[in-house]
A protein has these predicted regions:
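Acidic, polar-rich N-terminal leader regions of halophilic archaeal proteins
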Residues: 1-126
Length: 126
């Protein structure tokens, strides 16, 4: 795969993830009786986890795919949106701001997106 093909393939995935994060944020209704663990985990499995995975995949496998700044920020913003929604499912109102690299390193260390979210957001308390 050429660099251009890789950039286009990853770009399309990033665009879909960013659009879904925007939709999830717009549709979010705080749980009436937090925590809503199932919804929190869904935001991780269907959102933050795939966003981090795109970053990891692009940085491994022998090909260092470059993301233009707007795509990188869209992917990082989507991940942070889902981490914010995850915390909100526990009744915690916060705007998180982590780098994809921080999250990717944690994912590689823990192999568990729920652990990554707990470490980054502090939710739920341990």
């Amino acid at each position: 795969m050429t660099d251009q093909e890789a950039a286009e393939r990853f770009g399309a995935r990033i665009d879909r993830l960013a659009d879904r994060a925007t939709s999830d944020c717009a549709a979010f209704e705080p749980p009436a009786d937090p925590p809503d663990r199932d919804q929190a985990l869904a935001y991780l499995r269907e959102g933050a986890g795939p966003a981090i995975s795109v970053y990891v995949e692009a940085r491994t496998g022998g090909q260092m795919v470059h993301f233009p700044p707007e795509r990188y920020h869209a992917l990082e913003g989507a991940m942070n949106d889902w981490l914010t929604l995850y915390a909100a499912c526990y009744g915690v109102d916060s705007q998180v701001s982590y780098t994809l690299r921080e999250a990717a390193e944690l994912l590689l260390d823990t192999a568990n997106i729920a652990d990554v979210a707990q470490i980054l957001t502090g939710v739920p308390e341990r």
